[in-house]
UniProtKB/Swiss-Prot annotation:
PROSITE patterns for this protein: NDPK_LIKE
Residues holding ATP: 11, 59, 87, 93, 104, 114
EC numbers on record: 2.7.4.6
Name of the encoding gene: ndk
Cofactor(s) for this UniProt protein: Mg(2+)
Subunit structure, interactors included: Homotetramer.
Entry protein name: Nucleoside diphosphate kinase
Amino acid sequence: MAIERTFSILKPDATARNLTGAINAVIEEAGLRIVAQRRIRMSEAQAKTFYEVHAERPFYGELVSFMTSGPVVVQVLEGENAVAKYREVMGATNPAQAAEGTIRKKFALSVGENSVHGSDSAENAKVEIAQFFDEKDIVG
């Protein structure tokens, strides 16, 4: 199995409830290492660029507003099959459908306020990581 990296965001609904430590514990218990982490306030420009793939979707404006409404924690996670592993650990987008023990089942408030983002592919992880971190910021 290949060691790879994925990108994670702890969203404003999670940071507002001081869940960074609790979510990090779930991530680490799953065997993923947090090799870079930064708490930031995402600008509107950053959010629009990051979620550009959703620009034509009806929820785009609301998503950008939500992601800029408070601090977020951006992270690089590393481990065997990190992208798939983290998606499993996050759980379904809708917390009502998420498996027991997943981040979204434990912490998400709703489909929109679902506490975390994770890359959907290794290729997208590289692009997303590069938007927030230089290679020198990632320490494994």
